[in-house]
Structure formats: structure tokens, C-alpha cells
A protein has these predicted regions:
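Short amphipathic alpha-helical interface segments
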Residues: 39-55
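Mid-protein regulatory/catalytic core that forms ligand/cofactor-binding pockets
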Residues: 119-218
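A short, conserved structural fragment
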Residues: 79-89
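Basic, amphipathic "hinge/linker" alpha-helix immediately C-terminal to the N-terminal HTH DNA-binding motif
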Residues: 89-104
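Short alpha-helical segments that sit at the start of domains
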Residues: 16-43
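Short amphipathic alpha-helical interaction segments
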Residues: 65-77
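Short, intrinsically disordered or compositionally biased N-terminal tails of bacterial proteins
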Residues: 1-21
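Short acidic, hydrophobic short linear motifs in intrinsically disordered regions
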Residues: 53-64
């Protein structure tokens, strides 16, 4: 059951169903229009605020590639749920917001730019490590489709199973076929057994990251 607008969330909710919380934050509210931001923008906003400690709305808008109006709405919704607070010095995460960020980081556990040619899908390529995500990977089609919807040119999904890095539908052992590519990923992200990695490419680095986030969310 989702909470009503204007009502904060419990620590248990922040530490539990954070994927459902993201969906709720992006939901349209009658009678107004649907917000111009999505779950990936909320995730990126939380990361940017957590990393900065405190940040102004204009700077956050630039970091997200959104207009200030959209960022104002996003921050209002985060504040309504007790996840952020705003002062003249900028906005910051509350203790509840920081708890949520740590929970997110426990699943979306690593990010890296990928320069390995075999794994490149665009001018800029971003890889995200999803802890425990391999169990939800079939052939990587769902991840690719979500990445493309987010603006990326494409995506490839890798999994670590039985100690081998694989690309479902392409190779069961990347190390034997493309050792330099496998080494690059293992060193950059350090996946463990049962983890998944999504790599997305785009002409713009922020779009590549949004594509990777959209793909990664299918594995949560």
C-alpha cells in the first residue's frame, strides 16, 4: 500500500521496498500533469546529494540534466517523505535519506566508465554492478530495451555464475573468448558470484548512465 502525498515514510519503508518508493515518487497526481522526471532521475538525485553533502537546486538541475522546475518538484516530493531537507545553503539528505541511499548502494554497488572496445556500445559507456542481479537475467533483452527507452544506444548484460563471467546468449565464459574484456570488468567492478553488470552506451555520458540505471532497475 502506497502512502498518501505529504506523509513521510518509516525507516522500515526506506530500508525495504525502495523500488516501490521510487515508483511512487514519480507517479502523477491529479489534477496536475505527470512529472517530467523518472525513477532514474530520482536515483541520480539521491546519489548527487549524498556525494555533495549539500547542493543548491540550480547545481542539482545541471547535474541531472533537468529543468529547475522539475527539480523543484522532485525535491518537494523527497522532502514530503522526510528524505531531504532544504535551507538557504541548499538541500541535503536526512538520516532517513542517508539510510535509503545506503540501501540502494547495497544493490547498485558499483559504477565505472568502460573503455574496452569489445564492450563499447557508444561514445560513452557506463557499467553498473547489481548485487544478486544474475538470477533475474535471461538473455539481456529486457535490460537492453529499458536502456534504449532511457535514451541509450544499447546495452549488454553480464553475469558471474560458477566463477565465470558470461554474456547470456553470446558467451558462457568471457574470460576464454575475450580475456582482456573480462579482466577489465573484474578489475573495474569486482563482481561476486550471482552478481550482474549492465553496460550502456550513448553519445552523452549522462544518458549512458541513465540507460544503465534503467537497465539495472529491471534486476532489482
Amino acid at each position: 500500500m502506497f502512502l498518501n502525498p505529504g506523509v513521510g515514510i518509516t525507516p522500515e519503508r526506506a530500508m525495504g521496498d525502495w523500488r516501490g518508493l521510487l515508483e511512487e515518487l514519480c507517479r502523477a497526481r491529479a489534477p496536475g500533469p505527470a512529472p517530467s522526471f523518472s525513477e532514474v532521475h530520482v536515483l541520480k538525485a539521491i546519489e548527487v546529494i549524498a556525494t555533495a553533502g549539500r547542493i543548491g537546486r540550480a547545481s542539482l538541475a545541471r547535474a541531472l540534466g533537468l529543468g529547475e522546475g522539475a527539480v523543484r518538484t522532485l525535491l518537494d516530493r523527497l522532502s514530503e517523505r522526510g528524505l531531504t531537507r532544504t535551507s538557504r545553503r541548499g538541500c541535503e539528505l536526512t538520516e532517513l535519506g542517508l539510510a535509503l541511499w545506503e540501501k540502494i548502494r547495497s544493490r547498485l554497488a558499483g559504477k565505472a566508465e568502460v573503455g574496452e572496445p569489445f564492450l563499447s556500445l557508444g561514445k560513452h559507456n557506463v557499467a553498473l554492478l547489481v548485487r544478486g542481479g544474475a538470477v533475474k537475467v535471461r538473455r539481456g533483452i529486457e535490460q537492453r530495451d529499458e536502456a534504449v527507452r532511457a535514451g541509450a544506444t544499447g546495452a549488454v548484460t553480464l553475469v558471474l555464475r560458477e566463477g565465470r563471467l558470461a554474456i547470456p546468449g553470446i558467451t558462457d565464459d568471457l574470460s576464454s573468448e575475450r580475456p582482456e574484456a573480462a579482466e577489465h570488468i573484474m578489475e573495474a567492478l569486482g563482481p561476486g558470484e550471482g552478481d550482474a553488470i549492465v553496460i550502456c552506451g550513448a553519445d552523452d555520458p549522462l544518458v549512458a548512465e541513465y540507460g544503465a540505471l534503467a537497465a539495472a532497475l529491471t534486476l532489482i
